[in-house]
Amino acid sequence: KAVIDQVSNPLGFRWFKFDADKGFFLIGKPLKLMGASRHQDYENLGNATPDALQIKDIELLKAMGGNYLRLAHYPQDPLILETCDRLGILASVEIPVVNTITESDAFTNNCLNMQTEMIKQNFNHPSIIIWAYMNEILLRLKFSNDKPRQQIYFDHVRELAQKLDSLTRKLDPSRYTLLVNHGSWDLYNKVGLTKIPMIVGWNLYSGWYSGIPADFGKFLDRHHKELPNTPFMVTEYGADADPRIRSFSPIRFDKSIEYAIQFHQVYLNAMLSRPFVAGGMAWNLAD
């Protein structure tokens, strides 16, 4: 009889854990999760990226020594996770809830439905260790001139985060939850978003958008001091660079290769020297 349809699921045996003091462990051994975030697009092709280029991205990550991929900010082509399974790249996947929310039942239900579908569709991939559900959700603040109304908005954001986190833990108790914030420490703590997920993600750009690279290590230490029981990762970091631009005296915003290298050296040294930092993802894998 002819085969009409078939479903193939990967099989992988591994166990892992996050520790707020010691970082990440895979099969009982410490492993610093280092890699990149990834958007699914390519020059002149946009989102219609052919399989060969999808696979090439993951092979590039592996070749540069990466062991972790953050799919940002949405589930991507199934081939990506299939390739991560095959190459031994660990991964997180997230739904597209970015920068702001809509305060409505329809929006909330859509978010919950997206999270449910993402988990059920990808549950069997051994490469996945984390389900995520928000990215920089307080970046574009609403109601800045109306503090009482803004507080109501913050309450809605926190309630949605709690619903998504609780749903995720119920659907898959074997994996971790992640909520990703931009570098506004006081704001996210005030709203209560750092207390909800199992792992907190920070997108940090000290020395690029603001500040100096040396501020980065201070931020890492602050998290460990003020949230000592919560594991965390640096889910984004980086400085824009253009391969055509070189400099003997690199400075911020010159987009030179030299400034980007200096930037990465500071960040990598800070993360690698602190066992409590579970990992770091450069932004972005490919542009």
Model-derived features: positions:
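Substrate-binding clefts and catalytic carboxylate motifs of secreted carbohydrate-active enzymes
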Residues: S127-A132, L141, P148-D186, V191-D287
